[in-house]
Amino acid sequence: MKYGEKEIQEFDINAEENFWPNEHEKNYTINIELPEFMCLCPRSGYPDFAIMKLSYVPDKKVIELKALKLYINSFMYRHISHENSANEIFDALYSQLEPKSMKLIADFNPRGNVHTVIEIDSETF
């Protein structure tokens, strides 16, 4: 096993070192695009690819970017649906960051003539 595979396999999104203190009191938005998301279809095992777009207004914490990359890469060999992967990512990040607001857009590549976009927005809760 290569060192990168090991790091991804052993990654824990809930580890304290993955989140840093937000040193600013003013409201500002962090926009992050993750263009290489991959998971496996739970039915066929075929790969699904997506661009994940995360946008949040931090409160007390921000996510360390390498941690976010490792977390997203941890889905690479998981059999999980579009809806479940987007919701799992949103829920994990939202519960750890406790942001003032957060939105995740999971824009999956078309497969079988179907293009899926999942949007989850804390403003709609």
UniProtKB/Swiss-Prot annotation:
Enzyme Commission number: 1.7.1.13
GO biological process: queuosine biosynthetic process; tRNA modification
Binding site for substrate: 63-65, 82-83
Subcellular location: Cytoplasm
Enzyme category, top tier: oxidoreductase
Active-site annotation: 41 (thioimide intermediate), 48 (proton donor)
Keywords, sorted A to Z: Cytoplasm, NADP, Oxidoreductase, Queuosine biosynthesis
Pathway as given in its UniProt record: tRNA modification; tRNA-queuosine biosynthesis
GO cellular component, one term: cytoplasm
GO terms for MF: preQ1 synthase activity
InterPro entries cross-referenced by the UniProt entry: GTP-CH-I_C/QueF, NADPH_dep_7-cyano-7-deazaG_red, QueF, QueF_type1
Reactions it catalyzes: 7-aminomethyl-7-carbaguanine + 2 NADP(+) = 7-cyano-7-deazaguanine + 2 NADPH + 3 H(+)
NCBIfam families the UniProt entry points to: QueF-II (TIGR03139)
PANTHER family according to UniProt: NADPH-DEPENDENT 7-CYANO-7-DEAZAGUANINE REDUCTASE
Function: Catalyzes the NADPH-dependent reduction of 7-cyano-7-deazaguanine (preQ0) to 7-aminomethyl-7-deazaguanine (preQ1).
Family classification: Belongs to the GTP cyclohydrolase I family. QueF type 1 subfamily.
Descriptive protein name: NADPH-dependent 7-cyano-7-deazaguanine reductase
Organism: Sulfurovum sp. (strain NBC37-1)
Lineage of the species this protein comes from: Bacteria, Pseudomonadati, Campylobacterota, Epsilonproteobacteria, Campylobacterales
